[in-house]
Amino acid sequence: MPTATADRKLTAKDFQVPFPNDWCPGCGDFGILNAIQQAFAKLELEAHKVAVVGGIGCSGKAPYFFPTYGVHTLHGRLLPFAHGIKLANPEMTVVGVGGDGDGLGIGAGHFVNSGRRNLDMTYILFNNEVYGLTKGQAAPTLAMGLQPKSLPEPNIQGQLNSLMMAMSVGFTWIGRGYSYNVKKVVDLVVEAIQHPGLSFLDILQPCPTYNNLHTKDWYAGKDLNSGQPRIYWLDDTDYDPVIPPDADEAAALGKMNEFLSKVHELSLIHI
């Protein structure tokens, strides 16, 4: 396995494998995969000390594309597998990668209990609002009333807010990225892995095959008269999300209220 030396830095290519990839052209999964590979290189991780754990669906194939340890698990069960790996091998870097349907549908119970345990690992959610591998059914992240082309009728169920869920059940680092901005996602993955506790990274992504509503152009705001992108980056504002370890209760609650105000913004999407 390649390792960093004084004369050679690791690159994303060191975390790639020569296996064919059948994701659809334009799929956001490619950007997320590339960002994780770059993050591993930036952190100078040793491949034999990393485990990538996937669920089902398109994103569940991700572990096959790393020269690390990898597990392709059962529907909604990637987090228990990841917990077992971390508990048995505390020195390993464990990264869970799964879709919004996998993690917030049948896997929602494990999502909740993961927060309670707060193990030192990272969970990356591929959020495209549909079950891509099984022809585009509504995922728990799709808002009620929306009807992408894959649905015969508008979605009749309410939308789950993954960031709210993560905060309420105990994840200690929470972030959001956008798959078409790989550079930003690399930084988020690095920060999530470096966090000494349970980190959750929600990555918004288009599904060009089944979700014709929230496309690359939609995120870019090309349908708006203003032409303003729907995404903005908190790094470009004065928002400070960190709750210091010595913060008193009032200060911590103030930070949490700031977080809640960002999570519930409707006109723009914070990243």
Q: Where are each of the predicted segments found?
A:
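Conserved small/polar residues in nucleotide/adenosyl-binding loops
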Residues: 269-271
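Glycine-rich ThDP/TPP pyrophosphate-binding loop and its adjacent helix/strand module
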Residues: 106-121, 126, 130-267
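Short catalytic-loop micro-motif centered on adjacent basic/acidic residues
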Residues: 23-25, 96-98, 173-178
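Conserved phosphate-coordination/catalytic loops
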Residues: 26, 30, 72-76, 105, ...
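Thiamine diphosphate
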Residues: 1-132, 187
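Alpha-helical protein-protein interaction elements
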Residues: 7, 15, 100, 222-225, ...
